Amino acid sequence: MSEERIAALRKMAEAKPDDPRPRFGLALEFEKAGRWDDVVQTLRDYLQRADDEGNAWGRLGAALRHLGRDDEAQEAYRKGVEAAYRHGHPTMAGEFEDVLDSW
């Protein structure tokens, strides 16, 4: 993880508050570092601004699961399934359904 990259992405997010892309990039950097609370907060912020196709919902579910917040994680995966189907990504939806089935 690069603190410089995190700082740059934060600056980009502040400069363009309606653009969700820097927030997604920031969440990925936090994910690489295992900073799960930051991942959750940043992805929730991203999801308020973006019509996500499922990927962010799955990442949110995984981060919440790392934190032991299983009910919230399962809800995120369910929303990921809905988003993936809505955007024509049945394989992604199936992967999330498999995660839910294995709980």
Question: Residue spans of the language-model regions?
Answer:
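Residue at a conserved register position within TPR or TPR-like alpha-solenoid repeats
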Residues: 30, 64, 84, 97-100
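Conserved structural position within tetratricopeptide repeats
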Residues: 11-14, 44-48, 82
